[in-house]
Amino acid sequence: MKKMVLAVCCCAALLGGCGDRYEAKSGLTPYKEEIFAMDTYMNVCAYGEQSQKAVEAASAEIQRLDELLSVTGESGDVYQLNQLGQRQVEADTLAVISRAVEVSKETDGLFDCTITPVMKLWGFRDGNFRVPSSEELAEQLAKVDGSKVHMEGNTVTLLDGVTV
């Protein structure tokens, strides 16, 4: 959990801090790296003596979380959880799923981490985009229910075929 919090803080600080104005005022040259993770391009940037080390550490953590939380990466917790329906997961995965379930409750289901079947239907997972029929949507929406995600210790259980 501490690693995840650190990664998020680093990313927020790094992603927002690479403007030309800071470089001009400080006289420091940034170390920058562009990565692709979590289905998006990211620019990681840092200034100072340890900038390269900081950027490499942040990039490695982003890649680790991407693999761990990926719906399609077969070695990750989320992929395996979706395949098995129940699984012991790493602390970072548990924290993300736990918070997602909380947000689902707080928003009365407007945000729901079990939307995966609908995402697949529209082609967001494999890039084969299409507009599904009303019948297909109704069938897949029946599989969306954040209340069917249960956690006990570090074990997550997905009931009735829901996926995250």
State each model region's role.
Residues V5-L6, C11-V164:
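A contiguous, well-ordered beta/alpha segment that forms the leading edge of an enzyme domain
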